[in-house]
Amino acid sequence: MGKLNKSVQLAVFAGVAAAGAQAEPVTVVALGDSLTAGYGLPDGQGFVPQLQDWLDARGVDAQIVNAGVSGDTTAGGLARLDWALSGDVDAMIVALGGNDLLRGLPPAVSRANLDAILAEVAGTRGLPVLLIGLQAPGNYGPAYKEAFDGMYRDLAETYDAALEVSFLGPLVAGTDMATARARYMQGDGIHPNRDGVEVIVEAFGPRVAELVERAAP
């Protein structure tokens, strides 16, 4: 009888331990620039906190870590990748390239940096990734635009990453650029306002939920 009670106690303890392990949220690091960091917005209104609220409201057990740094290029993201991965990380959102565009950096340079990031995150560490791109403006010329826009598709395919082709794409869905800029952008015309971030999160939220599901044990 004593052995039976001990066995029951061990089984209960094991069950509690397993339940505790399952209760740990999936940690998703959002590696990006000012669009990720929430530039120009009060606390709680940027991309990461609004995304966290979206997931919480739908019962998605995840913690989104804001690893966005304003002004960061793909090279900057690569340089601090080890820091971003230093904790217990289960998945990553990679949203870099906007500042490469603003500086007119060669797409081949941006591509090499993103390739190195994804090689470490998805390749070496085997973590699921959501890659969020941007689209180059037409005034950079067709060759530049084709190379820049295409690198996100190519890299997502290479590393089996989920892909959203443009961080700002949801803002112009169903409307024109002038209307979207007036309604959803801050005065600088580069960064989304609170309402713009909300639109972006509504569009990307389901993809992040899928990412969490892929990362869950």
Language-model features: locations:
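N-terminal signal peptide c-region/cleavage motif recognized by signal peptidases
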Residues: A18-G20
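Alpha-helical cap/lid subdomain in secreted, periplasmic
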Residues: V60, G76-P217
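Short histidine/acidic/glycine/proline-rich micro-motifs that form metal-
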Residues: L35-G38, P42, G68-D72, N99-L102, ...
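Bacterial N-terminal signal peptides that target proteins for export
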Residues: M1-L10
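Short gly/ser/thr-rich secondary-structure transition/capping motifs
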Residues: A11, A75-G76
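Serine-esterase "nucleophile elbow" of acetyl-processing enzymes
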Residues: Q22-S70, L78-V89
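Flexible, glycine- and charge-enriched loops at secondary-structure boundaries
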Residues: K6, L41-G44, S70, P107, ...
